[in-house]
A protein has these predicted regions:
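Residue-level marker of structural boundaries
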Residues: 52, 80, 92, 104, ...
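Basic/polar phosphate-binding segments, predominantly the helix-turn-helix DNA-binding elements
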Residues: 18-25, 42, 46-87, 112-132
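DNA-contacting interfaces and partner/effector-binding or oligomerization modules
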Residues: 1-12, 152
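Short, positively charged and aromatic/hydrophobic N-terminal segments
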Residues: 21, 148-152
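A generic structural signal for secondary-structure junctions
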Residues: 33, 114, 138-141
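A short, Lys/Arg-enriched amphipathic alpha-helix from helix-turn-helix/homeodomain DNA-binding modules
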Residues: 13-54, 88-104
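Short, basic, alpha-helical segments at the C-terminal edge of helix-turn-helix-like DNA-binding modules
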Residues: 87-96, 135-148
Length: 152
């Protein structure tokens, strides 16, 4: 969905200031109110907290009292990525941290990040970073030892 936000004036019927319009098709727009924008921010906060076990879009829309289409379009327009891309980015950042700072196995890291199968974690990590989690860990460790060697 290509999304583009445009400002719009006060809505005379609801007496609410429109937050903007999101283009969702050639001639289709969704209007967001300030209340909708607040719900999208709340959804973002929930996803940040629950990235390892994110709610479905249907459940998330009920949690923030916003229909699924507005939630998906508004989230993409505000954060320039889909809801699943956002949760994956958080998980991958957490994975980088765990790989760099712990000796946990790839299976243990995958479980901590909410993956039922470590192979799915490895595929997503490789897609995101261009290398497997194990290769990432080895490269990070090599880099740390190299810096240590240079400083001593």
């Amino acid at each position: 969905i290509g999304a583009e936000i445009q400002s719009s004036p006060e809505n005379v019927f609801t007496n609410q200031l429109n937050y903007g319009e999101i283009k969702i098709g050639k001639d289709r727009y969704i209007t967001l109110t300030a209340s909708d924008a607040h719900a999208i921010q709340k959804a973002h906060d929930i996803l940040t907290e629950e990235a390892c076990n994110p709610p479905t879009i249907k459940a998330l829309s009920k949690m923030v009292f916003l229909n699924e289409q507005k939630l998906k379009a508004g989230f993409s327009a505000k954060y320039h990525m889909s809801i699943s891309e956002y949760t994956n980015s958080i998980r991958m950042t957490m994975a980088e941290n765990l790989l760099s700072t712990t000796d946990l196995s790839i299976d243990e890291i995958a479980k901590q990040l909410g993956y039922n199968y470590s192979s799915n974690f490895v595929k997503m990590f490789k897609k995101t970073h261009g290398k497997t989690p194990l290769a990432f860990r080895k490269l990070k460790n090599w880099y740390i030892y190299f810096i240590y060697f240079l400083l001593n």
